[in-house]
Amino acid sequence: MTSATIPGLDTAPTKHQGLLAWVQEVAELTQPDRVVFADGSDEEYERLCAHLVEAGTFQKLNPEKQPNSYLALSDPSDVARVESRTFICTEREIDAGPTNNWMDPAEMRGIMTDLYRGSMRGRTLYVVPFCMGPLDAEDPKLGVEITDSEYVVVSMRTMTRMGRAALDKLGDDGFFVKALHSIGAPLEPGQKDVPWPCNDTKYITHFPETREIWSFGSGYGGNALLGKKCYSLRIASAMAHDEGWLAEHMLILKLISPENKAYFIAAAFPSACGKTNLAMLQPTIEGWRAETVGDDIAWMRFGKDGRLYATNPEFGFFGVAPGTNWSSNPNAMKTIAAGNTVFTNVAKTDDGDVWWEGLEGDPQHLIDWKGNDWTPESGEKAAHPNSRYCTPISQCPTLAPEWDDPQGVPISAILFGGRRKTTVPLITEARDWQHGVFIGATLGSEQTAAAEGKVGTVRRDPMAMLPFLGYNVGDYFAHWINVGKNADESKLPKVFFVNWFRRGDDGRFLWPGFGENSRVLKWAVERIEHKADGKSTPIGIVPTAADLDLEGLDVDPADVDEALAVKPEEWRAELPLIEEWFEFVGEKLPTGLKDEFDALKERLG
C-alpha cells in the first residue's frame, strides 16, 4: 500500500511539512488501514472509549460508583515497565553510561525498522500531538506520538495537553519530539482481534541526540504513553543537560503556614516510598495546609529573579492503585471518585465497582485482574501490584492554583528520600548544594518486592532517577553540581534527606508517617526561615526531638529519638557501599563527589 492509498493522509489538519513527511514515512512502513489525527475533543474521547468497550479492551464501570470510568485488563505478559528492554542509543556508548542498556543507534534502527514493517496492518494509525507543561509557557516542549493503540490515545488525553491546541502550538515549522509506538500486532483480513494486543518482542528505545523515542510490542503504561517517563525524564533529562535546566522524578508540594506563607517543595523518592501520598499530604498540625502541584515529574529552571522554578509537565495522575485508600491518601481517593478514570489491572466487584489490595472493604467475590473469579480463599492478589488509575489532575481537591502557571513555582526545598530500616535519620539537612548533590547521588532504598532481587538489599537509586536517566550518570551528577555553581547561592533551595521508614529492633516503624510527615516538613521550612535549631552531625544537620513540633502526637519520645539518631558505626558500614557505587559510576564521577565522600569518611573517624 502506498501513501496515496492510505485514507486520512491527504486530509491532515496541519501544514507542518516535517510532521507530514514523518507521518507519511511511518505509514508507508507500518501499513495501517487509515490515518487519524487526534483532536483531543470530548466527542473523540467518548467515541474511542465506546470502540474500546466494543473491542473488549474496556469494561464500562457502574456510573453510580465510578462515573464515566472504565476498566482495562492487560495481557499477563504486559504489566509494567521493562527495564531490561529499555535502551538509550547514543552514538558513543560512554554517553549512555553504566546505568543504561546501550546499542548502536544504526543497529537499533535496523532491528526496529524490521519490526515496524507492516506492524499496523488492519489497524488505525493515530497521530497524537501533545504538549508537556502549560501550552502558554515561554518554551513549550511539544511532542507527537504515532500509535496504533486507542488505549494510548485516550490515556494521553488524560496525561498530557493533547490534541488540536498542541498541534496549533506547533505551527508550520515548530520543533517536536518524535515518539513512535506500535503494539506490534497486525491483523490479517478477517482475523479476530484480542482484548489486549501486544507482542512478545518488546523494545523501548530512546535516541537522546535526535530527541526520538521508538517503542514496540507493549501497550502498557510507561512503555506506551511516551509522554510519561520516555519524554518527561529520559529525553527531557538530555535536553535539560544541554539547555541548563533539570528534568527530575519529583513531586511538587505547596505547604502553607498559619501566617499564610507558601513554600514549594520538590521531592524525589524511588517507587513505593510514598511520593503520591506526600504530594497530596493532609497536614496534622494546627494551622498548616498543603496543596498539590504534581506527584511524579518536576521540570526546573532558573527564573529571572535567580530562583529555581518548577513545573509539572503532566496533566493527569498515573498512580499505583494498591495501597491507596481513604486513610493513606484521601485526596487521591477523592480525585478518583470524581470519575473520568481509566483503571488498568485492578479487580472488579459484582456491582461494577473497582477494588484493590489495601482498599477498605472485605469483598467475598471479585473478578481479578486476569479476568477470573476471585474469593479470599484464592490465595493470590486480586489486583496486580502495579495496577494503575489514570485520572485528570484537575479533579484533585487540593490542587494548587499555581499548578498550571507557565512560569512554574519557586522551589524553597528539595527532599531526597528512600526506604531504609536503619542508618538514615528521619530528616537531615545538607551543609550546602554540593553536599546535597552527594546525598541525592548516594540515595539508596531497600527493595520491596522479591522479584526485584533480594528483599531488604539496598539498591542505589540516584535522585530516584536510576531507570530514567537519558545519559551518563556521572555527567548527570556533574550537571547537578554545575547548576548550583552557576546560581546565586543565597537563592538556591535547601536540600534535605528524609526517611519515613526507620524501624525499631522489633521491626515496628518508629515514625507514624503519612499526614504526620507535615511535622518534619515544618522543621525544614523553619530551617529555611532560620527559625529552628538542629545539631551538626557527621552526615549533616539533624533536629533533636525538641526541635520538632510533636504537639498532640501519640508517639513514644524514645521512638522519636531513635528515628533521629545518627549512629557512626552504621554509617561506617555504609561507606564501602557508597564506594562500590561510585566505582560503578566510573571515570565520569565528578571530583566534587569524591571530595564529599572523603570528607564524610573523615568526619566519621
UniProtKB/Swiss-Prot annotation:
Pathway(s) where this gene product acts: Carbohydrate biosynthesis; gluconeogenesis
Presence of keyword Transmembrane helix: no
Keywords (A to Z) from UniProt: Cytoplasm, Decarboxylase, Gluconeogenesis, GTP-binding, Lyase, Manganese, Metal-binding, Nucleotide-binding
Source superkingdom: Bacteria
GO process terms (BP): cellular response to glucose stimulus; gluconeogenesis; glycerol biosynthetic process from pyruvate; oxaloacetate metabolic process; propionate catabolic process; response to lipid; response to starvation
Pfam families: PEPCK_GTP, PEPCK_N
Record note on what altering residue 75 to Q does: Significantly reduced carboxykinase activity. The affinity for PEP and OAA decreases 9- and 2-fold compared to the wild-type, respectively
Cofactor: Mn(2+)
Keyword presence, Transferase: no
Main location: cytoplasm
Family per similarity comment: Belongs to the phosphoenolpyruvate carboxykinase [GTP] family.
Listed name of the protein: Phosphoenolpyruvate carboxykinase [GTP]
Gene transcribed to yield this protein: pckG
